[in-house]
Amino acid sequence: MAMQFYASPEQIMRDRSELARKGIARGRSAVVLSYAGGVLFVAENLSSALHKVGEIYDRIGFAAVGRYNEFENLRRAGVRMADLNGLSYDRRDVTGRALANSFAQTLGAIFTEQSKPFEVEICVAQVGVTAEDDELYRLTYDGSVNDEPGRMAMGGQAEAIAGALKSNHRSDMSLGDAVKVAVRALGSVGGEGGAARTIAADQLEVAILDRHRDGRTFRRVTGAALTALLDDGAAAASTDAPAAAADSADVEERPDSEAP
């Protein structure tokens, strides 16, 4: 008769945590922060087809690192939940806090009940009337939820990136300044010999939640509009830069939410 191997519950949880952390660390990082005109998402992403940043509802956005198929399934489930609640009750009843709690329950159940946890780290962000009203929620692979103070970094070197963000971030920054701070923070790690890196515009995924818009606020910033924001020689962006950028072909007007 074969001998049955025993592993304590504590060891099983440690092994699952280690698996999830290693999976998250292999991916490239992302940052989310408040600025004068809304909430900014910046992710290092070499793929033009797979998005790490997306929309969930009118004033709610989503960013993630880790396994794409896992966090995209969560985002789609969040879109369906938000659409259902908005149609059944009122669009104002759909909140980032409720969606974060729903994601946390799903991630926690998978972590404790399944043999393999999701290798993901997620941010759910809701833009407010002012920067002080913005809500940023960090969700980890085990279902833990943390309310972040206006800025956050996700990924394998999140602590170092968060340190760079903390020293330079201000909630009253323009969009141009916020993008530069975010990109510098992402480039502060991963360089050869610990040196800072320069990240090209085509390696970045950038989106905003524009607090000055009614209805759907999520917009992507791409192409010439993004290059102009990254250009040190360009004029400083004003707080209404998102609305101006939306008039160009480089900012996508179609939100990537699903129909109910």
From Swiss-Prot:
Residues 237-248 have a biased composition (Low complexity). Pfam families: Proteasome. Pathway: Protein degradation; proteasomal Pup-dependent pathway. It is found in: Cytoplasm. Residues 237-260 are annotated as: Disordered. The 20S proteasome core is composed of 14 alpha and 14 beta subunits that assemble into four stacked heptameric rings, resulting in a barrel-shaped structure. The two inner rings, each composed of seven catalytic beta subunits, are sandwiched by two outer rings, each composed of seven alpha subunits. The catalytic chamber with the active sites is on the inside of the barrel. Has a gated structure, the ends of the cylinder being occluded by the N-termini of the alpha-subunits. Is capped by the proteasome-associated ATPase, ARC. Belongs to the peptidase T1A family. This is Proteasome subunit alpha. It comes from Salinispora tropica (strain ATCC BAA-916 / DSM 44818 / JCM 13857 / NBRC 105044 / CNB-440). The gene is prcA.
